[in-house]
Curated annotation (Swiss-Prot):
Keyword Protease: no
Superkingdom, taxonomy of origin: Eukaryota
Family indicated by similarity: Belongs to the CCDC89 family.
Signal peptide residues on this chain, from the entry's feature table: none
Subcellular location(s) per record: Cytoplasm; Nucleus
Keyword terms: Coiled coil, Cytoplasm, Nucleus
Name assigned to this protein: Coiled-coil domain-containing protein 89
GO CC annotation: cytoplasm; nucleus
Primary location recorded for the protein, binned into one broad class: cytoplasm
UniProt KW Protease keyword: no
InterPro entries referenced in this protein's UniProt entry, alphabetically: CCDC89-like
């Protein structure tokens, strides 16, 4: 991009060259003054024509430089709008991939829930079989022994009561797990809806960017037509043309500063989105690791340890879900702020172009 300091340097060089040409013309006129009266008359006519031609050449040269600077500024604005449109399309594709990933994870959670229900049913079936076997053995022992049978029967009753208590605790924990799983599924649906809203917002933003690009192209054609009309109407207004040139240079510098700030904001936004995605992935990996470890260790522990591990796994899952929700709310708030800033910059840019 052309630096703001380069244009004054080019203008100085143009002024220096123009002065050099005028000095050459003045030297030629000095030589003509030393000629005879008739030659002086011809020299004066020649000098008048040379002055008119040099003035016309200077005006045309400045107009050509002005038109070149305007065209370069408009081409750079169009290139920046194209880059912005490409970045928005990439961001839209990333959001779509995230939505698909969340759907896949939701299906995995549903599968895990079904496996847990099957495990519970199998546990109940085995418990019923053990109770029947226990009753059969108790009756056989009553027929064979008396006092020992009574003592063992009391022990068996205690163990049976403890087993029932554990079964009730397991049922309570199972209900809590189902409630928390339902809540987590609802939160996942909310996240998916938010992603869909974000995708629609990005599509609208892409459409606005395309409209801005079309408007810029139309403005370029309109400015070109106005430039031709200005060259015809203002051929003798040198001072006004110089002021317009300085104003356009100032506007171009402001547009360059706005474009640099906007590019920096977009890069910062992309870095923050990547950081939030990395944190969310870490939380998801931790949750998966906890579920895998729970499934591996479930068969190796007794009922009391299994209940404890279930409680800890539920607490970790709830904590991870809360952390993920907080990070998503922060990301949503920050994204809204960035969108507001971007809209303000777009309004300022359209105002400067108009």
């Amino acid at each position: 991009m052309t630096s703001p300091q380069k244009i004054p340097i080019d203008l100085k060089m143009m002024i220096k060259d123009t002065k050099q040409d005028m000095d050459d013309v003045h030297q030629a006129l000095e030589k003509l003054r030393s000629l005879s009266q008739e030659e002086r008359t011809e020299a004066e006519v020649l000098r008048s024509r040379i002055d008119e031609q040099s003035t016309l050449i200077c005006i045309l040269k400045r107009r050509a430089d002005e038109m070149l600077l305007r065209c370069q500024a408009l081409e750079k604005i169009n290139a920046e709008l194209e880059n912005l449109r490409a970045n928005v399309q990439v961001e839209l594709e990333n959001e779509r991939k995230k939505s698909e990933l969340l759907e896949q994870r939701f299906m995995d959670l549903a599968s895990n829930h079904r496996e847990l229900i099957n495990f519970k049913n199998e546990y109940k079936s085995q418990n019923a079989k053990l109770e029947k076997e226990n009753e059969r053995l108790r009756k056989e022992n009553e027929a064979l022994f008396s006092e020992e049978v009574q003592e063992k029967e009391e022990t068996i009753l205690k163990l049976t009561q403890e087993l029932k208590d554990l079964a009730e605790q397991h049922k309570i924990l199972e209900n809590e797990y189902q409630e928390k799983t339902t809540g987590f599924q609802i939160k996942l649906k909310e996240l998916m809806n938010l992603h869909r809203i974000k995708e629609a917002s990005l599509k609208n933003e892409l459409s606005d960017t395309q409209k801005q690009l079309k408007t810029a192209v139309e403005m370029c054609a309109e400015l070109d037509l106005k430039l031709r009309q200005t060259q015809v109407k203002e051929s003798m207004r040198e001072t006004d043309t110089q002021e317009r040139l300085e104003k356009l240079i100032k506007e171009k510098d402001e547009l360059i500063d706005l474009s640099v700030q906007r590019g920096k904001i977009i890069r910062d936004k992309q870095v923050e989105i990547q950081e939030l995605e990395r944190k969310r992935q870490e939380a998801e990996n931790g949750r998966r690791h906890a579920e895998d470890r729970f499934e591996k260790e479930a068969a190796a522990v007794n009922s009391e340890l299994r209940v404890k591990e279930l409680r800890e796994a539920l607490e970790r899952a709830e904590f991870s879900c809360n952390e993920l929700k907080k990070e998503f709310e922060a990301f949503k708030k920050h994204s809204c702020e960035l969108l507001e800033k971007e809209k303000e910059l777009n309004c300022k840019l359209r105002h400067m172009i108009i």
